[in-house]
Design a protein with these regions (language model features):
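Acceptor-substrate binding/catalytic loop of class I
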Residues: 22, 42-61
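Short glycine/proline- and charge-enriched loop/turn segments
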Residues: 37-47, 93-94
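Short, glycine/charged-enriched secondary-structure capping and boundary segments
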Residues: 3-6, 33-36, 91
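A C-terminal cap/extension of S-adenosyl-L-methionine-dependent methyltransferases
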Residues: 64, 68, 73-129
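Conserved class I S-adenosyl-L-methionine
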Residues: 17-42
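Phosphate/oxyanion-binding loops and surfaces in catalytic or ligand/nucleic-acid-binding neighborhoods
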Residues: 11, 25, 68-72
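Residues in well-ordered alpha-helical elements
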Residues: 2, 60-63
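A short glycine-rich, Lys/Arg-flanked "PGG" loop and its adjoining helix->strand segment in the class I
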Residues: 2-17
Length: 129
């Protein structure tokens, strides 16, 4: 993480913006990304190892890491499926080969929840100080 953030800092000019989309370190996030998306043969849609528990970060941890590299975290919002059952439906269809990755978002209908507490994934942006 530190190497990536340092490279982002070097690439940005003062006031430049870094947008991010990442996975939280909650129990639910681990279950979804490490078990459902990577571990269970029935629902595996990502190669094992794409996500590792050691690389998951909560919003507070990420904010601290951004600050260490001269990036001020400006906003974080929850990003989730409107209906979790639609995510399961899309994952199973993707696993069967019935749909492509590009067809997942309209099926799942992801929504941003600006004031929500991110349980699984979250979006945000930081600005170079």
């Amino acid at each position: 993480l530190d190497l990536v953030l340092e490279q982002a800092r070097l690439a940005l000019r003062p006031g430049g913006v870094l947008f991010y989309d990442t996975v939280n370190r909650t129990l639910l996030a681990r279950l979804v990304y490490l078990v459902v998306f990577q571990g269970l043969p029935l629902t595996r849609i990502m190669p094992p190892g794409r996500y590792a528990a050691s690389r998951l970060r909560g919003p507070g941890e990420l904010g601290e890491a951004l600050a260490r590299h001269g990036l001020r975290n400006e906003d974080v919002c929850d990003f989730k499926p409107r209906n979790p059952a639609s995510l399961l439906k899309a994952v199973l269809a993707r696993r069967r080969g019935a749909i492509t990755d590009e067809q997942i978002p309209p099926i799942v209908d992801f929504v941003r929840v600006p004031d929500g507490s991110p349980l699984v994934t979250y979006l945000g942006y930081a600005r170079k100080v």
